[in-house]
């Protein structure tokens, strides 16, 4: 054990790492509670309609089956704030995969057999699941995800675009994408004899799950405990409560025993959200020297009939490049599809793919280096709000990345480099992600033996949150990080926001920093030995996080990629990929690099392998498991490097940090797509860039 304080930013190893690799860390579906039963959800097999009958006799006759819950016998719940949680409350089927029953048995295999033994009949009505750019049901919502105005108009875009001597007018298409965390969405629920509900849940935010369950089951928040000590990823899909927690709690109440429900992988696409498909038209007008004079980004996407969710893909165009004349808009149509939701960098990931691809097309039209074009249009103030940036080091990221990557040696001519049948190319794209922070509470405790304890209902979804929070506290307390215990992932701890929006560490860390600072002050007032119970202080950052900042706060980055395109097979391989990021003060260099590279890997998947399709006839996602939905494997993601700019930004939070969980994916797909264009001379505007699409374009 080290006895010297480590500087904030040191590459401290994850403190739970050994427990995870040895199996000591227990996830939501690994608890083996005494008397635990197992549940299997039953999805609707029609795309739209209602259930007319569910015959349960055959299922209940199977050995070990204890119960079948349907809309006819499930507990009635209160009105949820999220309609996707209103499961088993009526006979409605808004989309294929909507859960219509749950079977509970002694074993998982028995529950699955019971589900297969159910006989369900439906009344169907016409359905529609395919998004088109000219869909008759398109409308303009009031806001897009994040509360952003759906439309924004600055100056006279039409006039400026018409007058621009150089124009780009292109449309980019991305299909639905799925989060697919390693750990499926899982819950284990049990009720005490006194009526207290405890749920072990695979969630990005136990506080919100607790509050939702309390509302649904008519309980006070203090009658519900939600525990999420270890979570195997989420990428946004566990950022809101999901139906498995409700179904497990229902089944546990009905049977009087603990119930475990792990969502089957093939069910997840229809239940836990997805990145909505987008059709994005981007128009750029520029002077011949590359100065942008007109920017338009218009997005078409889908939502469900259950609730509205609008992917904010046009919002990044409001902050990236300066132009007095701009138009950004979102239009959406409600289809008979599962409800879309957050997926790593919602809005920014698809939006920056389209925008950065269009910027590359503009560079080609101008005959200008794509790095130089971005540098010439780097604004001093945020174009949307006109606020000064708290810090904007995009130019430094581009320059540093270009130097590290060897960009100056690039032959700008498309299709100029070959290795036998392989066509080689390089591409670049910029990245941005907003800086968020939410109100959080934390507790700091000093024990008489000189150790410290931090408590905050944060969630570690694989990011290393425990470790970083210990580092923040240790820095303030001027003690070795091993001298600080961190308790997280329990709704009985001080309330804290979810792990999402790249805001978790900023939010929780702010409250931990404040609590630790208050503890130092309290200890400074104590001249004698500590009492046997120690000293405890709490902190609340509601006031600080609610204060409006006079600055526009964003993280920035730049991606550089080199690809090899096999002219015989159409296969694209990323030979190397380099990202440079400006994300405030990096709090742990080891976990930060992991986050950056993880995001870049997801961007690679978005560009080359990940694809999902809604079946027009049957209404479901045809790529519903990892055999058909292809996430990158380790062999696909070799040669990835992540670096960062040391950034001192005093306008953020006490740590000077920006979020890093999402910016790695932003722009990554565009850099790869731009590299494919440079290799082949062909511009493909539909993701992913699969071999069949490359071959069709090549020949």
For every predicted segment, state its role:
Residues 230, 234-256, 260-262, 465-466, ...:
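Thiamine diphosphate
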Residues 78-82, 114-117, 201, 210-212, ...:
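Short acidic, glycine/serine/threonine-rich loops at helix termini
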Residues 71-72, 218-225, 253-259, 288, ...:
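C-terminal catalytic domains of large/alpha subunits in multi-subunit enzymes
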Residues 15-19, 116-123, 127, 204, ...:
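Extended active-site and interfacial segments that coordinate phosphate-rich ligands
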Residues 90, 183-188, 279, 438-443, ...:
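Short glycine-rich loop/turn motifs
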Residues 106-107, 257-301, 513-529:
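Phosphate/diphosphate-binding loops
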Residues 1-145, 167-170:
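Flexible, low-hydrophobicity surface segments
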Residues 10, 16-22, 146-187, 193, ...:
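Glycine-rich loop/linker segments at domain edges
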């Amino acid at each position: 054990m080290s006895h010297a304080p480590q500087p904030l930013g040191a590459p401290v190893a994850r403190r739970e790492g050994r427990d995870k690799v040895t199996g000591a860390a227990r996830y939501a579906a690994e608890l083996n509670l005494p008397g635990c039963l197992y549940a299997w959800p039953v999805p609707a097999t029609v795309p739209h309609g209602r259930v007319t009958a569910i015959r349960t006799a055959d299922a209940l006759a199977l050995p070990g089956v204890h119960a079948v819950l349907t809309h006819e016998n499930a507990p009635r719940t209160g009105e949820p704030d999220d309609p996707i949680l209103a499961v088993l409350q009526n006979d409605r089927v808004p989309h294929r995969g909507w859960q219509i029953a749950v079977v509970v048995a002694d074993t998982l295999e028995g529950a699955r057999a019971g589900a297969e033994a159910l006989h369900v009949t439906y009344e169907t009505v016409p359905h529609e699941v395919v998004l088109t750019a000219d869909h008759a049901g398109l409308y303009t919502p009031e806001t897009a995800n994040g509360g952003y105005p759906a439309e924004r108009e600055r100056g006279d875009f039409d006039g400026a675009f018409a007058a621009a001597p150089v124009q780009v007018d292109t449309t980019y298409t991305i299909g639905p994408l799925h989060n697919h965390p390693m750990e499926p969405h899982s819950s284990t629920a049990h009720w005490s004899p006194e009526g207290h509900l405890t749920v072990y849940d695979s969630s990005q935010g136990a506080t919100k799950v607790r509050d939702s369950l309390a509302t649904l089951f008519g309980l006070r928040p203090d009658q519900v405990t939600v525990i999420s000590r270890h979570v195997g990823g989420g990428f946004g899909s566990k950022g809101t409560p999901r139906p498995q927690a409700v179904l497990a709690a229902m089944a546990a109440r009905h049977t009087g025993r603990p119930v475990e429900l792990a969502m089957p992988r093939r069910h997840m696409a229809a239940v836990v959200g997805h990145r909505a498909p987008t059709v994005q038209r981007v128009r750029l007008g520029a002077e011949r020297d590359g100065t942008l004079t007109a920017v338009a980004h218009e997005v078409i996407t889908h939502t469900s009939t259950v609730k509205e969710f609008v992917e904010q893909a046009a919002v990044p165009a409001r902050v990236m490049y300066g132009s007095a004349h701009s138009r950004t808009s979102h239009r959406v149509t409600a289809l008979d599809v599962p409800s879309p939701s957050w997926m790593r960098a919602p809005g920014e990931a698809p939006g920056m793919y389209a925008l950065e691809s269009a910027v590359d097309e503009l560079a080609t039209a101008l005959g200008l280096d794509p790095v130089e074009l971005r540098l010439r249009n780097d604004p001093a103030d945020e174009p949307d709000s006109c606020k000064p940036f708290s810090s904007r080091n995009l130019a430094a990221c581009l320059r540093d990345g270009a130097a590290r990557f060897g960009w100056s040696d690039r032959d700008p001519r498309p299709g100029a480099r070959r290795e036998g049948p392989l066509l080689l190319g390089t591409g670049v794209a910029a990245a941005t992600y907003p800086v968020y922070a939410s109100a959080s509470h934390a507790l700091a405790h000093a024990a008489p033996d000189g150790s410290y304890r931090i408590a905050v209902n944060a969630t570690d979804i694989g990011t290393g949150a425990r470790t970083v929070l210990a580092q923040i506290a240790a820095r303030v307390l001027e003690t070795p990080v091993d001298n600080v215990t961190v308790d997280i992932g329990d709704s009985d701890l001080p309330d804290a926001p979810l792990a999402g929006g790249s805001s978790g560490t900023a939010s929780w860390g702010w409250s931990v920093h404040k609590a630790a600072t208050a503890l130092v002050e309290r200890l400074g007032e104590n001249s004698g030995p500590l009492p046997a119970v120690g000293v405890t202080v709490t902190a609340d950052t509601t006031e600080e996080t609610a204060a409006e900042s006079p600055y526009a706060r964003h993280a920035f980055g730049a991606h550089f990629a080199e690809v090899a395109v096999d002219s015989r097979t159409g296969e694209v391989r990323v030979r190397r990929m380099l990202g440079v990021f400006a994300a405030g003060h990096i709090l742990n260099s080891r976990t930060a690099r992991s986050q950056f590279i993880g995001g870049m890997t997801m961007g690679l998947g978005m560009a080359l392998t990940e694809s999902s399709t809604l079946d027009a006839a049957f209404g479901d996602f045809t790529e519903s498991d990892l055999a058909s939905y292809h996430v990158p494997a380790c062999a696909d993601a070799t040669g990835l490097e992540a670096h960062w700019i040391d950034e001192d930004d005093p306008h953020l939070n006490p740590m000077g940090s920006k979020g890093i969980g999402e910016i790695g994916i932003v722009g990554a797909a565009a850099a790869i797509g731009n590299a494919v264009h440079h290799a082949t001379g062909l511009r493909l505007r539909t993701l992913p860039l699969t071999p069949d699409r490359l071959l069709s374009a090549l020949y």
